[in-house]
């Protein structure tokens, strides 16, 4: 018998074209901000492809990138930018933007999500009246219930309260690096189930729900449930990242219920116990933008702004590859150490 050798993408390298723009690392391991850049100008630039290629690589390496007061952006430009980031960083042909399954019922743009607290409450059930004691449990990766989950999410805020409503991100690269070697190898051997039961329930009760492809031909499952490797390799960086834990990751496969609870609790405790692998972003201006890579970060809203003012934003998500693990890929810290030699 002849075995077929599996080949994986080569990591992409920065060209340096973004060095001309002021930027700073918000924390050492996650988050970069371009305080004065204009994304609309980048999109319309003659070298837009080169700019977006390096922006995509930067997001993949840093997890999340921030821009301030992008008032020249509208919904169509936001959709174009999100899609082109994926194209310039090698997403599969035929993969476009995610389509929300409720867009027909809401009569919305299928590729543009509206962040509205009232809508979220209606989708996910009645408001929880218990005291909030573990907000860390709201960390999640967007669309992880899909066969091919999202790559880049772009969130553009148009209305912000005077205080509150910050968003946090946690680095999946650093979560993996914080594990001991035996735990790393153990997690690499496992898969976990991601699902959103509230969407599945709506699919069973709402005749008008969209049942076509959600940004990729493979994304048609109306159970909104999918299993993925708990450790995946990022195709752009080539680094291993923990791809588990959080709101939508419901169960570790092939272990007992008790063991699954222990493993998922360990991951979420790593997030909550280590603020130095997180970054927190304050939305200061209408038009502030965050673009993050769901393949290597979890993110979490801060639900402290209710009654303090309106909060409205628009979200787009590109669709990436089916998650995979290259067992020979390095961790982020291993790759950075090798590059420094």
Curated annotation (Swiss-Prot):
| Cofactor field | Fe(2+)
Give the E.C. number(s). 1.14.11.-
Q: Name one GO molecular function term.
A: 2-oxoglutarate-dependent dioxygenase activity
rRNA-binding as a keyword of this entry, yes or no, is no
A cellular-component GO term for this protein = cytoplasm
| UniProt keyword terms in alphabetical order | Dioxygenase, Iron, Metal-binding, Oxidoreductase
A Pfam family assignment: TauD
What superkingdom does the record give?
Eukaryota
State which pathway it belongs to. Answer: Secondary metabolite biosynthesis
User: Bound how, and how many: what does the cofactor note say?
Assistant: Binds 1 Fe(2+) ion per subunit.
Report the InterPro entries cross-referenced here.
AtsK-like, TauD-like_sf, TauD/TfdA-like
Q: Where does 2-oxoglutarate bind?
A: 167, 311, 315
* Binding-site residues, Fe cation: 140, 142, 299
User: Quick one: which residues bind substrate?
Assistant: 100, 315
> What PANTHER family has UniProt attached to this entry?
ALPHA-KETOGLUTARATE-DEPENDENT SULFONATE DIOXYGENASE (PTHR30468), TAUD_TFDA-LIKE DOMAIN-CONTAINING PROTEIN (PTHR30468:SF10)
Role noted for this protein: Alpha-ketoglutarate-dependent dioxygenase; part of the gene cluster that mediates the biosynthesis of oryzines, natural products with an unusual maleidride backbone. The two subunits of the fungal fatty acid synthase oryfasA and oryfasB probably form octenoic acid. This fatty acid is most likely activated by the acyl-CoA ligase oryP to give octenyl-CoA before the citrate synthase-like protein oryE catalyzes condensation with oxaloacetate to form tricarboxylic acid.
Instruction: Identify its protein family.
Output: Belongs to the TfdA dioxygenase family.
Name listed for the protein in its UniProt record: Alpha-ketoglutarate-dependent dioxygenase oryG
């Amino acid at each position: 018998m002849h075995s077929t050798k599996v080949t994986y993408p080569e990591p992409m390298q920065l060209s340096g074209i973004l060095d001309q723009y002021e930027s700073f690392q918000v924390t050492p391991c996650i988050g970069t901000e371009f305080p004065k850049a204009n994304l609309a100008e980048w999109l319309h630039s003659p070298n837009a492809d080169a700019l977006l290629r390096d922006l995509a690589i930067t997001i993949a390496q840093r997890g999340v990138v921030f821009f301030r007061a992008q008032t020249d952006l509208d919904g169509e430009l936001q959709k174009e930018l999100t899609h082109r980031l994926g194209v310039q960083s090698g997403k599969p042909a035929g993969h476009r933007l995610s389509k929300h399954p409720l867009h027909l019922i809401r009569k919305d743009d299928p590729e543009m999500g509206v962040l509205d607290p009232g809508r979220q409450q209606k989708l996910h059930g009645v408001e929880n009246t218990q005291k909030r004691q573990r907000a860390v449990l709201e960390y999640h990766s967007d669309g992880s219930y899909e066969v091919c989950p999202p790559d880049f999410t772009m969130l553009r805020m148009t209305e912000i309260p005077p205080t509150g409503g910050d968003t946090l991100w946690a680095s999946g690269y650093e979560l993996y690096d914080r594990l001991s070697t035996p735990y790393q190898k153990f997690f690499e051997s496992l898969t976990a189930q991601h699902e959103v039961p509230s969407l599945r329930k709506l699919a069973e009760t709402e005749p008008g729900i969209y049942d076509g492809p959600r940004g990729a031909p493979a994304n048609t499952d109306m159970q909104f449930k999918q299993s993925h490797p708990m450790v995946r390799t990022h195709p752009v960086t080539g680094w291993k990242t923990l791809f588990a834990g959080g709101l939508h990751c419901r169960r570790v496969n092939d272990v007992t219920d008790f063991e699954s609870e222990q493993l998922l609790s360990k991951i979420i405790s790593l997030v909550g116990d280590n603020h130095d692998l997180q970054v927190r972003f304050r939305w200061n201006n209408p038009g502030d933008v965050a673009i993050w890579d769901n393949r290597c970060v979890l993110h979490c809203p801060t639900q402290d702004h209710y009654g303090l003012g309106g909060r409205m934003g628009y979200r787009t998500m590109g669709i990436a590859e089916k998650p995979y693990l290259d067992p020979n890929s390095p961790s982020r810290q291993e790759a950075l150490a090798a590059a420094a030699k």
